[in-house]
């Protein structure tokens, strides 16, 4: 073998697929992902993972992606993040949030501003919805200096047929994230949210709101949930409804969120109650950031300045997914996250300490 052949950082399995591609793109290091569902009846990449790789190709220049005949091995040699304007058609197997979320890791470090129109389903049970990204993830970006970032809902599209359109615009282009120091728990001052529907009776929206308020009424803070009823050509191709709730700290600017959508035959009041209970659980099992915001915060801290950053996290957040993330960061960036208790009296929270790698936005330099 030639000595000039690239050395690949190798991963196995389909878990953390998007983030491994994102980390490789940020680091510029080639990776190899093998044994992707090799033991399944339908082995290899799913259609949405192939679609995600196409999206990565469209926002980078010089990336090389090789997929084996069986689809169980992917070799990725990252190029430069260039961004720009594009349209991405999402498969019906995943909502637009599955594709928007990883772009939040890349867009601020691009050569050009990101302007991507995503078409497809706008909500699902398992992936981030539009409001969760707008009110939950983008505020985390703002904490790291990414302030000009927006997600516009042009059309809602409920499963299974979708028909939604979402426009991601990221105008902030920064050299590197600012250093994070957040060692306190934010105090929740208000709960906001939106209950939405497409091609169904507007009464379902009010019933979801009533169900959520029934759970949240005893909280010592303001609760404001708005109704968002979509009709006509902007309401997609399928009937559907859902609710997103966000707990906010006005003093600190942090937020937690919970969301879900209704299924055929489900009761709107029960969905509202369920999501409200999920929000309360998220608050109780979080510290500075929620469970679904933690990966974004950790990655931004890793690629920050060569300074020590600190973030308060809850022990409940140290799960298998978090451990896999830390191992992947160690493999690609060769840096570690150190965890220590807040103090002897506090057995719930830990302080995550990270020294930034001094990442530099090479795309911006080339620009």
Curated annotation (Swiss-Prot):
Checking Gene3D superfamilies in the record gives: RNA 3'-terminal phosphate cyclase domain, RNA 3'-terminal phosphate cyclase, insert domain
Q: What is its main location?
A: nucleus
| Disulfide-bonded cysteines | none
Q: Where in the cell does this protein reside?
A: Nucleus, Nucleolus
Q: What else is known?
A: Present with 10000 molecules/cell in log phase SD medium.
Reported function: Does not have cyclase activity. Plays a role in 40S-ribosomal-subunit biogenesis in the early pre-rRNA processing steps at sites A0, A1 and A2 that are required for proper maturation of the 18S RNA. RCL1 activates BMS1 by promoting GDP/GTP exchange.
Q: Which UniProt keywords apply?
A: Acetylation, Nucleus, Ribosome biogenesis
- UniProt-recorded name of the protein: rRNA processing protein RCL1
Q: Which InterPro entries match?
A: RNA3'-term_phos_cycl_insert, RNA3'_phos_cyclase_dom, RNA3'_phos_cyclase_dom_sf, RNA3'_term_phos_cyc, RNA3'_term_phos_cyc_type_2, RNA3'_term_phos_cycl-like_CS, RNA3'P_cycl/enolpyr_Trfase_a/b, RPTC_insert
Q: What is the effect of changing residue 327 to A?
A: Impairs the interaction with BMS1 and affects pre-rRNA processing at sites A0, A1 and A2
The record ties this protein, via Pfam families, to: RTC, RTC_insert
Gene Ontology CC entries for this record: 90S preribosome; nucleolus; nucleoplasm; small-subunit processome
One GO MF annotation is:
enzyme activator activity
């Amino acid at each position: 073998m030639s000595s000039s052949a690239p050395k690949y950082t190798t991963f196995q399995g389909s878990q953390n697929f998007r983030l491994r591609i994102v980390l490789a793109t940020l680091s510029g290091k080639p990776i190899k992902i093998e044994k992707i569902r090799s033991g399944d009846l339908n082995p290899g990449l799913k259609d949405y993972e192939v679609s995600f790789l196409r999206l990565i190709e469209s926002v980078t220049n010089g990336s090389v992606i090789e997929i084996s005949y069986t689809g169980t091995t992917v070799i990725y040699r990252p190029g430069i993040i260039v961004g720009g304007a594009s349209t991405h058609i999402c498969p019906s197997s995943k909502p637009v949030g599955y594709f928007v979320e990883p772009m939040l890791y890349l867009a601020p470090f691009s050569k050009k501003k990101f302007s991507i129109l995503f078409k497809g389903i706008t909500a699902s049970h398992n992936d981030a919805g539009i409001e969760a990204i707008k009110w939950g993830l983008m505020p985390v970006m703002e904490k790291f200096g990414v302030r000009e970032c927006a997600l516009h809902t042009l059309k809602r599209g409920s499963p299974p047929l979708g028909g939604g359109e979402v426009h991601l615009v990221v105008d902030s282009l920064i050299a590197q994230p600012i250093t994070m120091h957040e060692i306190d728990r934010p105090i929740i001052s208000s709960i906001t949210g939106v209950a939405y529907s497409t091609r169904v009776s507007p009464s379902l929206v009010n019933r979801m709101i009533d169900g959520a308020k029934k759970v949240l009424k005893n909280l010592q803070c303001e609760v404001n949930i708005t109704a968002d009823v979509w009709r006509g050509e902007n309401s997609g191709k399928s009937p559907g409804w859902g609710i997103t709730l966000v707990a906010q700290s006005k003093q600190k600017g942090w937020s937690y969120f919970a969301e879900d959508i209704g299924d055929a035959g489900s009761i709107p009041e029960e969905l509202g109650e369920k999501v409200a209970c999920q929000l309360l659980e998220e608050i109780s099992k979080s510290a500075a950031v929620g469970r679904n915001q933690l990966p974004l915060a950790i990655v931004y801290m890793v690629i920050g300045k060569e300074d020590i950053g600190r973030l308060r996290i809850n022990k409940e957040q140290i799960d298998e997914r978090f451990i896999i993330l830390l191992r992947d960061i160690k493999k690609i960036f060769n840096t570690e996250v150190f965890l220590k208790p807040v103090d002897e009296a506090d057995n719930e929270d830990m302080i995550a300490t990270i020294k930034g790698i001094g990442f530099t936005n090479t795309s911006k330099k080339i620009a």
